[in-house]
Amino acid sequence: AKLNAIDAGIAAQTIQLAAYTRDLGCCIFLSFDPRKIREVLGIPENLEPLLVLALGFQKEVRRVETVGADGSVKYWRDAQGVHHVPKRPLEDLLIIKK
């Protein structure tokens, strides 16, 4: 259960990083209907889909940016169609004890 989710996350990130090195886009989805995924892909009931990966050639321009002063991590598109993806800085996410 919990370890399966951790392993799935590690595998998904590895696939995403490998895709990036080959100029492919990859998006990890956690919001999906597991019953529909089982039905469409023929996955047996004893297996639980934990995430979905979309993988392919990118059609959009995406910019990963530092979160603004308002603290919002909501994605948005500008007038030119650029997909802005605000992320917290690494320093805010790591706990380093000295």
Q: Could you say what each language-model-derived stretch is?
A:
Residues 1-98:
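Acidic, surface-exposed loops and disordered segments
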